Amino acid sequence: MVAAAALETGEYQTDTEIPAGSSYTLPGTATQLTNAVSQADGSDGKITLEDAMAYSSNTAFAQLGVALGDEKVSSMAEKLGFDNPIAVDGSESTGTPWVSVASNFPTDASDDKLALASIGQGDTVATPLQNALVAAAVANGGKVMRPTLVDRVRSSDLSVISQTKPRVMSRAFSSDTAGKLTQMMEAVVTKENQNLAIDGVRVAAKTGTAQIGDGNTSIDGWVIGFAPADDPKIAVAVVVHNVDLYGSFAAGPIMKAMMQEALAE
């Protein structure tokens, strides 16, 4: 999301170097952010945008979010579906339409809170559906599609009675930005998370490790992605709650298995 907001300004490219470093003190506080791996620190305090994504650089994306400012980042979040409940097409057939609880990205945040939100921490809250829509938006060239519960209805002889038509909820970013995000998400797999790779298939992904709350040493392991990156057929979001593994290892194998199963059909 922060990477998309940066690319949309036209001032950043995948190889643009941004501030990183081994630690970053949240503005106006004594709280320091660090990175899980040394590659995320960059070199001489800087890292390319692509490598910041590939190595999950907390220090880089926290500083980037602050540099972009609350308006640009929160606006991108809203375009992607945050801060609004999401209705699911087809669910009204049950008599009670299914509406997903709204994900949340803070608005009018102070710089310290914006820095935390920019790495998925602090007051940021996201459902698996929301994060699946983010992955799908990149796969769809920047268009956020309305999720559907039923693809088609068939009669007893298997003929199609009705077919759900895809509907666009919003355009979050340009197709050019989507292409650059795809390149960066592929680097997540090729540079740092080879366990997510599928033979003969280009996989685009982003891992995440979210803290659950004060006093809880367990984490939520996340991964989102789509495949094939050059001709997307499936977008996935997986979260494994209350684990002690990074997202790549907790949620990654599940995403990989889902993709393999879907692409084998």
PLM features per residue range, with description:
Residues A4-V240:
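Beta-lactam-recognizing serine transpeptidase/beta-lactamase-like catalytic domain environment
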Residues S159-R167, P253-E265:
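Short, gly/Ser/Thr-rich active-site loops of penicillin-recognizing serine hydrolases
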Residues G179, F249-K256:
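Short, well-ordered alpha-helical segments
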Residues V134, E192, D230, D244, ...:
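Intrinsic structural disorder
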Residues V240-G252:
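A short acidic/glycine-rich loop-to-helix N-cap element
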